[in-house]
Amino acid sequence: IPALTRTLSAGETITLSASEELKVLDAPGHTFAHLCFLTLQDGVPQAVFTGDTLFNAGVGNCHNGGSPDALYETIAEQFHTLPDGVLVYPGHDYLANNLAFTLSLEPSNEAAKSWLVRVEGVDPGKTPVVTSIGDERTFNAFFRLDSGEIQASLDLMEASDREVFLALRAKRNHW
C-alpha cells in the first residue's frame, strides 16, 4: 500500500483522545484476514465498524477466501458478546433483503416485520439506517441460532449453534 507508515494488529488499541479509543478486532470469515474496529468512550463500547463481516440483519458471505467456520467464531466471539447499545456500522446496507431472509425462516419475528416496514422505501445511500447489537439480537437470524422457528425451518431441531449458523450461511448463499 503506497504511503503505508503503520500496520494494525488484532487486539491493538489506538488512543484517539483522553476518553476515546479504537480497538482493532480480528474478524476472519468473510475473507481469510479481516479487521473490524470497536470505538470505546471511557472504556465503554459505543460502536463497531464491521466492514463485510457483520451486516444489519445478516453476515458476510465467504466467497472471497473466507471460511464459514471462521465466520461463526468471529460472530460468536467478537460481536455476539458486545453490549446491546453498541451501534453497528457495516460496509454495505442490505437491511431490507436480510430482514426478508430472516422472515423466510422465522415468519413470526415481529421485530423483523417492524424493521422491514420502517426501512421500506428508504434509500440507504441517502439515509443510512443504523442498528444496535440489541436490535441485531431481535432480528438477525445469525444472532438467533436458538430460535426454534429458525431451527425448524432448517430441519435442525436441537442442533448446536455452529450447525445452525453453518446451515444459515449455506442457505443464504442460495436464497
Predicted feature residues:
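Short hydrophobic/aromatic-enriched beta-strand-loop microsegments
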Residues: 1, 49, 109-113
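Catalytic core of the metallo-beta-lactamase
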Residues: 4-104
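Accessory terminal helices/loops
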Residues: 73-87, 94-175
